[in-house]
Amino acid sequence: MEKVRRILVHLSKENAAPQCARFLQSITGHFVGSAEDQATVSCSLENNRFILGDRLCDGGVPLKRASFCPIKYLSDSEAVSLPSETLSRGVDVGVAVLLQSANQKLLLTRRASSLRSFPNVWVPPGGHVELDEKLLDAGLRELLEETGLNLSPDEICSRLLGLWESVYPPMLTIGLPKRHHIVTYILLKSSQTHLQIQASLRPDPAEVSACVWVDADLVKAVVSAVDGEKECVQIPADLPESIGVTKVSPDGEMSESSLPVSVLCNRAPDYGEDIERVSTGTKFALELWLKTLEHHADMG
């Protein structure tokens, strides 16, 4: 039997042996049914299998999907039209790192326009988990590969924030599913300020076209622009109209520029070409990050 070359999601309920999730299987729906979009699960990476279960220790971790998740609404006729190589993929595992500076700013990167999935969309640095890697090691490796930031586990504090069920394209109106992931969001707290970290930033232009540091006030505005809702997004009057960003040229040269805050508050379009925005999964992770700040303030 050919060795599996990717880490895949496996599911377990009620102490049953973990089974490899199917590409068309709703991971969130497996635990909460079709009506709900969020579950609380256990997760572990064992023998190159990412196992999600319903036996909770230490409260479990949140798992969420978009209200418009394509897997949730895929019809039987659409499902049978998918190519066999897509159907046989299983559900991949990704990791994304929310790097928090000592002055409580988060690093986001804009995906290069040449990337196959989610081009020009703002996300935390991240990528696939490789064989025999731990989640944190995978996150640190991806951070280094995409941004040039070389952090060792002993100089940061880390915690798992939550899990996001990601499907690309993100809506059926845009196209049938080609990729299905569970993204693990890990919070990394650095003892350096964002300016100190910025001095070491060397983004890979094949992956990243811009970087930005966001604070809690801006993040609150970003997450208020809930994807799938129709109401007009209200940007608080006390926020600046634009924010400073570091652009990355195709040859890797960095330059300072500005970006309208309204771009970061864009919603995912219902159809047609995607637009520059913060990804839906990232908004979920940013909401979880805000809760950690609130908890820290309460403890303080």
From Swiss-Prot:
The keyword Metal-binding applies. It comes from Danio rerio (Zebrafish). Disulfide bonds: none annotated. A motif (Nudix box) lies at residues 127-148. One of its GO terms (molecular function) is metal ion binding. It catalyses: a 5'-end (N(7)-methyl 5'-triphosphoguanosine)-ribonucleoside in mRNA + H2O = N(7)-methyl-GDP + a 5'-end phospho-ribonucleoside in mRNA + 2 H(+). Residues 88-239 form the Nudix hydrolase domain. GO terms for cellular component: peroxisome. Its cofactor is Mg(2+); Mn(2+). Pfam families: NUDIX. Mg(2+) binds at E142, E146. Its EC number is 3.6.1.62. The keyword Protease does not apply. This is m7GpppN-mRNA hydrolase NUDT17.
